[in-house]
UniProtKB/Swiss-Prot annotation:
Name of this protein: Putative manganese efflux pump MntP
GO MF entries: manganese ion transmembrane transporter activity
Compartmental location: Cell inner membrane
Keyword flag Transmembrane: yes
Domain of life according to the entry: Bacteria
Record-linked Pfam families: Mntp
GO biological process terms on file: intracellular manganese ion homeostasis; manganese ion export across plasma membrane
UniProt main location, coarse: membrane
Membrane topology value: Multi-pass membrane protein
Functional summary from the UniProt entry: Probably functions as a manganese efflux pump.
Annotated source species: Bacteroides thetaiotaomicron (strain ATCC 29148 / DSM 2079 / JCM 5827 / CCUG 10774 / NCTC 10582 / VPI-5482 / E50)
Keyword Nucleus tagged: no
Annotated transmembrane regions: 8-28, 37-57, 61-81, 109-129, 138-158, 172-192
Length: 193
């Protein structure tokens, strides 16, 4: 792969992180740098780690991962999105607010948005990337791009969501976005391959 192809691949992989970050930013409502950095770091780390894991185990597990990666990503995103949608219809007084900055949610979203990156790692092995020095550059670029796009998405979501989040039912739209990403992953794998 050329350098340009790796950067374009990194941007493509980071789009799910970007969309989830926008949804999370809408819910956060105000700039909170610590949770924003933790979220962006988690997304970047998992986007870098998953291709490495996929690359390491490609020869042994590729047929298993390729057959279910889209279902795993869809299930996780649909669960999180469905939960957010349901919570958006509860009364304000009795509702537990969905917290996209909680460690459990960040971890789950980071895994869900990086499942495709696992498959990319498998394809790296199939493309002939054979040693650690060759895989290092692509995974660092993928992690960096995902980190930056996640921060931008969070900031954008916060700025768009400020003042109008209540009127727009931010949790409803955030949930719809997560379910849509899950459906996109599922449709791409079932019908476009």
């Amino acid at each position: 792969m050329t350098g340009l192809e790796i950067w374009l691949l990194a941007i493509g992989l980071a789009m799910d992180c970007f969309a989830v970050s926008i949804a999370s930013g809408i819910i956060l409502k105000r700039t909170q740098w610590r949770p924003m950095l933790v979220m962006a770091l988690a997304f970047g780390l998992f986007q870098a780690l998953m291709p490495f894991i996929g690359w390491m185990f490609a020869k042994t597990f590729s047929h298993l991962i390729e057959s279910v990666d889209h279902w795993i990503a869809f299930a996780i995103l649909a669960f999180l999105g469905g939960r957010m949608i349901l919570e958006s219809f509860k009364d304000e007084d009795c509702r537990q607010t969905f917290n996209p900055a909680s460690p459990k949610v960040v971890f789950t979203m980071a895994i869900a948005t990086s499942i495709d990156a696992l498959a990319i790692g498998i394809s790296f092995a199939l493309l002939g990337i054979n040693n650690y020095t060759e895989i290092l550059s692509p995974i660092l670029i993928i992690g960096f791009v995902s980190f930056v796009m996640s921060l931008i998405g969070l900031y954008f979501g916060i700025k768009c969501g400020c003042g109008c989040a209540r009127k727009l039912k931010a949790e409803l739209w955030g949930g719809i976005i997560l379910v849509a990403i899950g459906l996109k992953i599922l449709i791409e794998h079932l019908f476009l391959q």
